[in-house]
Amino acid sequence: MANMEREPILSARDVEISFSLRGKKLNAIRRCSLDLYQGETLAIVGESGSGKSVFTKSFLGMLDANGSITGGSILFEGKDLAKYKTEKDWMTIRGKKISMVMQDPMTSLNPLKKIGRQIEESIELNQGIKGPEAKKMALEMLKKVGIPDPERRYQQYPHEFSGGMRQRVVIAIAAACHPQILICDEPTTALDVTIQAQIL
């Protein structure tokens, strides 16, 4: 079926994003649009600093405190995400329905918590599953992203992992709740080519 005959699961139209800096408004994104369909992989391509990450973070309410959506619409499940204002609003979709793999795993992981616990927390928060079942799912995700000896790694902290291994953990956390949309911000940068192909 052609895309024109289907409804996109996410439709962004003429999105504009600005940041306040020293009393001035800086326009970071001007009139960006896209349609994403079920089962589709969509790449956003642009030079470094062109606003790719800022644009996609707006789908999750993850802009910096001085940033805001100042124009356009982001339609998802019949609602305009561009109108969401509170953290309570965003928590209804973030992780559960739309999730994101960040570019830098060290800024995504809590250095004071064990890896297994961090995956479990995502499962608990977004699926309401706790205890042994959550642990079982966390271990399964570690296996899926190619982490050897998951039982041992489950008990370790982020600093005990290489950059590539941390990247895999971040992917496991984002994918653990089987979101409808998984946004990946250069998710395989720290991985070797074999694992890159497997993850993608």
Go through the PLM ranges and name each one.
Residues 81-99, 117, 125:
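ABC ATPase NBD coupling module
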Residues 80, 133-152:
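Conserved ABC ATPase "signature" region
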Residues 176-180:
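A short, proline-enriched helix->beta-strand linker immediately N-terminal to the Walker B motif
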Residues 156-161, 165:
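Conserved ABC ATPase signature
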Residues 45-46:
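The feature captures the beta-strand-to-loop junction immediately N-terminal to the Walker
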Residues 69-80:
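Conserved ABC transporter NBD signature motif
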